[in-house]
UniProtKB/Swiss-Prot annotation:
Lineage of source species: Bacteria, Pseudomonadati, Pseudomonadota, Alphaproteobacteria, Hyphomicrobiales
Chief localization: cytoplasm
Assembly description: Homodimer.
Ligand binding (ATP): 34-41, 152-155, 181, 189-192
HAMAP family in UniProt: PanC
Protein species of origin: Rhodopseudomonas palustris (strain BisB18)
Superkingdom assignment: Bacteria
GO (cellular component) term, any one: cytosol
Compartment(s) where it occurs, according to its Swiss-Prot or TrEMBL record: Cytoplasm
Enzyme class, first EC level, given as a word: ligase
Single GO BP term: pantothenate biosynthetic process
Catalytic center residues: H41 (proton donor)
Keyword Oxidoreductase among UniProt keywords: no
Annotated protein name in UniProt: Pantothenate synthetase
Annotated (R)-pantoate binding sites: Q65, Q158
Amino acid sequence: MSRSPVIVRTLPALRRALDTLRARNASLALVPTMGALHDGHVSLVRLAKRRASKVAVSIFINPAQFAPNEDFAAYPRTWKADLARLTAEKVDLIWNPDAKTMYPAGFASKILTEGPALAGLEDRFRPQFFGGVTTVVGKLFAQVRPDLALFGEKDFQQLRVVARMARDLDLGVKVVGAQIVRERDGLAMSSRNRYLSPEHRESATALCRGLKEAAKRIRAGEAIEAALAGSAALITAAGFKIDYLEARHAETLAPVASRKDGPIRLLVAATIGTTRLIDNVAV
């Protein structure tokens, strides 16, 4: 029988639980989530268990990172299933605050970052997103005080933004990126995949196929612009409307013109039906 994790929903209870977990100088890893957990989240938990002696998972659907026209109300809430997954993985602690705990009356602060947060990717189409992400992640780091925190590479710009924030503000948290977990047909696992109709689910694999084809052509010596144009045609033909499909420096997210400019990451965001998906691959 799996040991049940400690579930806390208030800051005093969190502090008491952390004091217990931290006994004997145990190292602590945090996996921040918004719930609706899938195998990608589970892979983060398993990596966390390899990297630290204790693992905490936060589940908080952060209203501050959703614009008024986005899917906050419709975002899947699957507490029972999430708890079952985390219990099976023998997580030590679940931090599950509500919005009033995270943003109490009179809350008037925000962490705003530059650098990767202004790369012209997600920030161009979701201008309030990273202000919401950095603020809530900064609060989670202050509340949980982990030694390390794990984020998936699927949200690649977010990973770079959070890592930059942690370094710049001397937060004492090592931000660790984990490889994208994909379905058997290549689609990157995402809580939003459940929004896809059967037809759109089948077509959605074009995102990964397009990225991998472009990466292959760039590695073979084709110009980046030409490789991306071919992949854009493939993705558009599958029914997607592309927000961006770009080659960026894998660390700074600055635009790159050729492989000589440094390690390259190809990133895409596109909508099929009403579902917006993101993905990326290394070159």
